[in-house]
């Protein structure tokens, strides 16, 4: 089974980009550009570090990757300790239900779920949740912060579960069975009730509204 070229893990110190040391640099660079473009500014303001396993990366190449992330608004974390020695590039299923006492902050405590969620599967996390895949009907995501679905979102989504009124839900295709933000609930009568394309759901007063996603500049 082939290893993912770039995997992303959220830690207390921000995001860590784990690179496959067996792949060519141009492949890694192009994959990073694709991931940044797909995120559409969602990670802007997040701190990040790059881990190349046990293999040393030439400074010029690493700087090139860092500059790509900078262009998309990420902030390099220059502290080498920012990459935990025991960090892993793939979250275990049990980790998706892990609890944390830390208050969710932009760029911190982001759980990356690098797979689609099927009916009956539930992800619960006190910080932000990023699903790199689809959320199918019958699947559920519960987040204390924002929810980003880099795919089609047709399940049950609960953002700002602890009462965070600023929480948002972003999906490339947003057609949830039920969506709630800080306890405010929305259940569309028809899948086409929400406009197509990448949409952002947020609270406006006591109502959930939907807006076309605009990348931060």
UniProtKB/Swiss-Prot annotation:
Superkingdom of origin: Bacteria
Pfam families: MinC_C, MinC_N
Keyword terms of this UniProt record: Cell cycle, Cell division, Septation
UniProt key word Membrane: no
GO BP annotations, alphabetical order: cell morphogenesis; division septum assembly; regulation of cell division; regulation of cell septum assembly
Family designation: Belongs to the MinC family.
Protein role: Cell division inhibitor that blocks the formation of polar Z ring septums. Rapidly oscillates between the poles of the cell to destabilize FtsZ filaments that have formed before they mature into polar Z rings. Prevents FtsZ polymerization.
PANTHER family: SEPTUM SITE-DETERMINING PROTEIN MINC
Assembly notes: Interacts with MinD and FtsZ.
Protein name: Probable septum site-determining protein MinC
């Amino acid at each position: 089974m082939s290893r993912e070229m770039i995997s992303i893990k959220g830690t207390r110190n921000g995001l860590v980009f784990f690179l496959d040391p067996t792949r060519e640099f141009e492949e890694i660079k192009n994959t990073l550009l694709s991931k940044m473009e797909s995120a559409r500014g969602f990670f802007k303001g997040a701190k990040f570090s790059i881990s190349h396993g046990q293999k040393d990366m030439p400074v010029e190449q690493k700087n090139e990757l860092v500059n790509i992330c900078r262009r998309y608004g990420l902030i390099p974390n220059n502290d080498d300790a920012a990459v935990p020695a025991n960090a892993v590039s793939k979250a275990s299923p049990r980790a998706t239900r892990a609890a944390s006492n830390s208050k969710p902050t932009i760029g911190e405590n982001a759980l990356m779920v690098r797979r689609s969620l099927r009916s009956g599967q539930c992800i619960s996390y006190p910080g932000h949740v990023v699903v790199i895949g689809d959320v199918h009907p019958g699947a559920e995501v519960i987040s204390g912060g924002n929810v980003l679905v880099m795919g089609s979102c047709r399940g049950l989504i609960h953002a700002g579960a602890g009462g965070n009124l600023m929480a948002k839900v972003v999906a490339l295709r947003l057609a949830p069975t039920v969506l709630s933000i800080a306890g405010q609930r929305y259940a569309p009568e028809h899948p086409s009730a929400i406009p197509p394309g990448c949409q952002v759901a947020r609270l406006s007063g006591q109502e959930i509204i939907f807006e076309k996603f605009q990348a931060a500049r």
